[in-house]
């Protein structure tokens, strides 16, 4: 049986290659742009096929399969239909990587990581309903490297088995992981402080906090993904961004609230002071707003992938 060679000819790499040739996909009908992608894909397949033949490889090069062939696409639809008929397909939500420049979802294999310098902030969320456990003048301290996601915060996630300390300071009563108290107080430049109580994370579940920027609540929830190696032990949770946030949010019936459009810009429900800004620019705007209202405890910059 001869080897049947095949080429995967779909995806962003083809579209990006066409755009590098000077083609603007927004200035032509989608069908026309697809025609150019089709022609480019065939051209590359022919080049690679010629190279493979010259290298002396043996295969049935007269009958290759290409994922852009209509018969191949039809077969995919047949398989999908069979899966649907067997009850294997359901409609749901899932967080995916997104490219603002391409306005398209990305596969994990298409994501490249580079070291970048990002702002990291520590923010106070004041208790609104302490459920008889905490007073309303207590603040949970969250940490994030993506300040632009703070407007989408719906929850604060703790680890059920961790011990959390209530610390009295000149900057308010703060809830942080007990093993990080001294380290965090030094970071916040707080020299006069006292630990007045301890709580298991499980004791603080369902307490609500006031979102520092908007008239809505942030729910205290529990999740196994919360670790003790960095941050504060109180994880800023925006279910519309990131897998951990999304899946733990589902357990508490929190919506996957996304306030960023396909271009990577903040949407109108973020408020006039933020709407229209690209997420990288929103980092600074959100941080300044938090500082202005007294919710920002610390701003640092870190290098990470």
Language-model region placement:
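N-terminal, positively charged nucleic-acid-binding surface of large information/translation enzymes
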Residues: 1-171, 238-270, 282-286, 290-305
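Protease-associated
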Residues: 151, 155, 162-234, 243-247
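Extended, non-globular alpha-helical segments
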Residues: 211-212, 277, 286-289
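Short glycine-enriched, charge-decorated loop/helix-capping segments at active-site entrances
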Residues: 271-276
């Amino acid at each position: 049986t001869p080897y049947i060679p095949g080429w995967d000819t779909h995806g962003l790499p083809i579209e990006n290659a066409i755009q590098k040739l000077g083609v603007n996909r927004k200035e032509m009908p989608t069908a026309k742009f697809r025609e150019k992608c089709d022609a480019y894909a065939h051209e590359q397949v022919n080049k690679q096929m010629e190279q493979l033949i010259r290298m002396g490889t043996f295969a049935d090069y007269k009958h290759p399969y290409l994922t852009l062939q209509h018969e191949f696409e039809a077969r995919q639809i047949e398989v999908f239909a069979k899966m649907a008929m067997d009850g294997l397909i359901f409609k749901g939500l899932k967080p995916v990587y997104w490219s603002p420049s391409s306005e398209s979802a990305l596969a994990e294999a298409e994501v490249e990581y580079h070291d970048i310098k990002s702002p990291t902030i520590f923010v106070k969320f004041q208790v609104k309903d302490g459920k008889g456990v905490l007073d309303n003048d207590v603040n949970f301290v969250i940490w994030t490297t993506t300040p632009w996601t703070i407007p989408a915060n719906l929850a604060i996630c703790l680890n059920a088995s961790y011990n959390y300390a209530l610390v009295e300071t000149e900057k308010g009563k703060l809830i942080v992981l007990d093993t990080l108290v001294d380290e965090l107080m030094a970071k916040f430049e707080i020299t006069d402080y006292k630990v007045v109580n301890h709580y298991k994370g499980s004791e603080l579940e369902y307490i609500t906090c006031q979102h520092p920027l908007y008239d809505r609540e942030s729910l205290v929830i529990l999740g196994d993904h919360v670790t003790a190696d960095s941050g504060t032990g109180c994880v800023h949770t925006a279910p519309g961004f990131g897998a951990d946030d999304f899946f733990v949010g589902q357990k508490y019936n929190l919506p996957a609230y996304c306030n960023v459009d396909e271009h990577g810009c903040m949407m109108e429900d973020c408020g006039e002071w933020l709407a229209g800004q690209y997420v990288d620019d929103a980092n600074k705007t959100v941080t300044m707003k938090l500082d202005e209202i007294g919710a920002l405890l610390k701003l640092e910059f870190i290098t990470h992938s």
